[in-house]
Regions:
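Phosphate/ribose-recognition catalytic cores of enzymes acting on nucleotide-derived substrates
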Residues: 2-3, 9, 15, 226-348
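N-terminal catalytic cores of NTP/NDP-binding nucleotidyl/phosphoryl-transfer enzymes
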Residues: 33-95, 101
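Residue-level signal for inorganic ion chemistry
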Residues: 50, 103, 142, 209, ...
Length: 348
């Protein structure tokens, strides 16, 4: 069976009881092959695939290799909070496709997306373990964080999972969450979590977010037509339209890396896959009485027609907050200073 998510094809493909020759992507338990053998599984939403997630997944991969079996990362779509609390939409640190890419870079064999439906939400912990982990995935070991919960009303925890493992013959390894001194406040110790990173992004603290992620926070989107004002002012910008509910940094101007993610030809000097220095404005353009919140990237030292391109903006540092200027000339001068500042930061 073959399906797709996020524009990427998924296929069950052949399976073995050893590590697989290539990464497989499955959606739903129906795509788990009927002859699937034993495996190591780690479970979580993994939004952001931050350093805590990376340590968990790396440990699962190492365990799978030592046991000579594939490693499966099981995640969920949509975010469980959207189903448990209808109307809620946690800001998304990574798209599902980006999540898969980041997870696969860590050496896993299978990326399994379980549709988080109202029926799935109602699974008791006992059914969750028996029907999914034991009967379908044939787990030999489950690797989770120490705060892991599962099943209806999150009634299952690590202790219950261990008891189930004793009954069904699989091991459970729970890992301590990562805590470090804050990158921006040396007097504060923080525990890396998706919630913490969302709060950093929301506050515009992209340095702290990057410290927890292990890389700059990325916003992806398609370049759409704006009002063309940047070009008139001498700073033509790519207006990036991210997916709904993306985690967008606080209003302000940022130094960032800009990358076109597609592979087709582009009219101009921008090469797909190459990253370019950029000064990025997030906000409503108050100088011109704007109301719509936008992400506008001025890509340094390039000329290109980017309309319709799928791009990524990796936020490195906040240069200043959003300001309203009385004169357009004052804005233009500040944009020049922002560009110089971004270039200096990104050239280090």
């Amino acid at each position: 069976m073959v399906t797709s998510f996020g524009g990427i094809r998924l296929g069950a493909g052949p399976c073995t009881r050893r590590r697989l020759a290539f990464v497989q992507r499955w959606r739903g338990q129906d795509e788990i092959p009927t002859d699937w053998g034993r495996c190591v599984v780690t479970i979580g939403v993994f939004d952001g695939v931050h350093r805590g997630h990376q340590e968990l997944i790396n440990h699962a991969v190492k365990t799978g290799r030592s046991r000579g079996v594939p490693t499966v990362v099981m995640t969920f779509d949509p975010h469980p909070m959207e189903v448990v609390f209808p109307g809620s939409h946690p800001a998304q640190l990574t798209t599902l496709t980006r999540r898969a890419e980041l997870v696969e870079e860590l050496g896993v064999d299978v990326f399994l997306v379980m549709p988080f439906t109202s029926d799935f939400m109602k699974l008791t912990p006992e059914r969750y373990v028996h029907e999914l982990l034991v009967e379908r995935l044939h787990v030999v070991e489950v690797v989770v964080g120490e705060n892991f919960t599962f099943g209806k009303k999150a009634a299952g925890n690590v202790a219950l999972l261990r008891k189930a493992g004793e009954r069904f013959g699989f091991a459970v390894d729970s890992m301590t969450l990562i805590s470090e001194v804050s990158a921006t406040d040396r007097d504060e110790t923080v525990t890396f979590s998706s919630t913490y990173i969302r709060s950093c992004v929301d506050a515009g603290d992209v340095v702290a977010a990057a410290e927890a992620l292990g890389r700059p926070h990325r916003v992806e989107g398609v370049v759409v037509r704006g009002d063309g004002r940047g070009k008139v002012l001498g700073f033509p910008t790519a207006n990036v339209a991210p997916p709904m509910y993306s985690a967008i940094p606080a209003d302000g101007v940022y130094a960032a890396w800009f990358t076109v993610l597609g592979h087709g030809p582009i009219a101009g000097s921008v090469i797909p896959g190459e990253r370019y220095q950029a000064a990025v404005s997030v906000g409503t353009n108050p100088t011109f009485s704007g109301r719509t919140r936008t992400v506008e990237a001025f890509v340094l030292d390039t000329t290109a027609d980017l309309y319709g391109q799928h791009v990524a903006v990796d936020f490195v540092a906040k240069l200043r907050g959003q300001e309203k200027f009385d004169k357009v000339d004052d804005l233009v001068e500040q944009m020049g200073r922002d560009t110089d500042h971004a270039r200096t930061l990104l050239s280090r």
